[in-house]
């Protein structure tokens, strides 16, 4: 009887861990999406990079989005 209960609890734990892992994978921010400056939430191999925006020489704030780690964009 104890073996049946132990086996049932072990299976429940394994199923719960698999479900939590699947939910965490779907919760990341995809490539090109807006992120926050805390650098958290982007999917693997992506980082949250922020750039200052200017209009007619006046700074208009900052925009952050998830891009590949190490990639830098520049205006030509």
UniProtKB/Swiss-Prot annotation:
Instruction: List the expressing tissues.
Output: Expressed by the venom gland.
Residue ranges listed under propeptide: 23-26
Q: Which domain of life is it from?
A: Eukaryota
What are the subcellular locations of this protein? Secreted
List the keywords (alphabetical): Disulfide bond, Secreted, Signal, Toxin
Q: Posttranslational modification, per the record?
A: Contains 4 disulfide bonds.
May I ask which residue range the UniProt record assigns to the signal sequence? 1-22
- Under what name is this protein listed? U7-lycotoxin-Ls1c
Natural source organism: Lycosa singoriensis (Wolf spider)
């Amino acid at each position: 009887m104890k073996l049946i209960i132990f086996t049932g609890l072990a299976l429940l734990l394994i199923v719960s861990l698999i479900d939590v892992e699947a939910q965490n994978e779907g919760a990341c921010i995809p490539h090109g999406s807006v992120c926050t400056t805390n650098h958290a939430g982007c999917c693997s191999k992506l980082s949250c990079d922020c750039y200052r925006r200017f209009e007619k020489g006046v700074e208009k704030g900052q925009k952050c989005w998830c891009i590949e780690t190490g990639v830098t964009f520049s205006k030509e």
